[in-house]
């Protein structure tokens, strides 16, 4: 039988490459890197063992006592006194939280996270499918291993939600070889209450032997059981040890989260250990798309450290960052262990208790060597893939800033909101700094509609903030002074996207977001400093929480209680009703 292998090569390695790998063992070809005398974590034996690890291009071709015959093109690294573990995996990345997928990966690789399973929502919203898929192929060229999920909903109420999330699009995404799961199921109430189209997508995901990720904050045991019956495999929303335990008891794999708005890992692990959990192979770690400054000291490494400090056995802590995840996603043949045939994603540690690697291999290339970053380069040419600055060909003027609706949003913490009725006069150009109410506007990306309301609990002394970074890709303005809001908006427009704070008609601080108005192209170190400065300035002006970028992102997020601003208007999540519809801008300038 002859297979048609023309066109795109769907195999991980070609026949020719596989023959070369075998030739290394025959002594006919030189190994490229030899990790000699390595004390490595054997994920199958669950113990530390000693071996020589042979690497050819991007693959581990042998692990054992033998040494290669041919060393002509080989770099020999003596690992005596060091510990070698598999590269860490982030199973639930949202790689557009001001950074972009490449800058996030470059930064995280310095701390040992070399594989990412990424949300597709931003690509789904902003690019045509063919463009998005070309970009997915482009990501294969970077040292990090990049995989994706396929969303079934937009986690907000959209004017065109049903046409955007249609079966043809979803099925094409699910069938893509780099897509490992469907979800996360932010619209689970629709699924539970009879949305058969979504249930069919879940069924199709399972038929393709891919995973379905939940999103079930605060769900009862019964709800969890029902959603398990409908096909969910894993959930990352447990906030306590008991919630994680309940998920485990209902047959879920449980992703334990530590993020910038839910830094719960320490509590979850402490409580799981108190509940008597001794078996950790159905648990793994995620940072669930945190904002840049949260990653200052790394990513998965921080969670491994926390687990070890809480008393989780060391080998389990490393498995929860690698082997458990690879096995769950059916990619254990290429990821998650130091063994023959795996992709050479390898961390070299100075001690078992310190998961920050001294050296990191990603696809067999050194991205960190003896503490030095050896991979600064950026490879993705975004403009080639229609990922360009935001072009806003419309303006707003004072006469568009009419606030007649007294119902608004009261911000209770970083992201939870409730409806409130403003008691103050908001029919003016400037609000007093004696209270924490501000003007709030959401304006369509194309300038066609706006929602004008009041927001309480965001800031006391903020002149104006404008952001093209938002949950729907629309523009958000917040502030006490309409003039400052306009100044900030005009600067966002000049930048081609960004987050801008203005005061006294001048720009006080800006984060340029030239990739779709959502992502920066700065290296993570620089972006972290810009974000920290923004947080500091907002806190000085009365922002009482710690993650303003998440607050802004989630103003439209209808998977969270209780009231949200969306393209269909001010929206009551509990009753699924529009409280105030959007209005058209007075005129298009």
Curated annotation (Swiss-Prot):
* EC category: hydrolase
Q: Name one GO molecular function term.
A: adenine deaminase activity
Instruction: Quickly give the catalysed reaction.
Output: adenine + H2O + H(+) = hypoxanthine + NH4(+)
For this entry, list what GO says about its biological process. adenine catabolic process
Please name the InterPro entries in this protein's record. Adenine_deam (IPR006679), Adenine_deam_C (IPR026912), Amidohydro-rel (IPR006680), Metal-dep_hydrolase_composite (IPR011059), Metal_Hydrolase (IPR032466)
- Pfam families assigned: Adenine_deam_C, Amidohydro_1
Which keywords belong to this entry? Hydrolase
Q: What is its EC number?
A: 3.5.4.2
What name is this protein filed under?
A: Putative adenine deaminase BC_3012
Which species is the source of this protein? Answer: Bacillus cereus (strain ATCC 14579 / DSM 31 / CCUG 7414 / JCM 2152 / NBRC 15305 / NCIMB 9373 / NCTC 2599 / NRRL B-3711)
Q: What is the lineage of its organism?
A: Bacteria, Bacillati, Bacillota, Bacilli, Bacillales
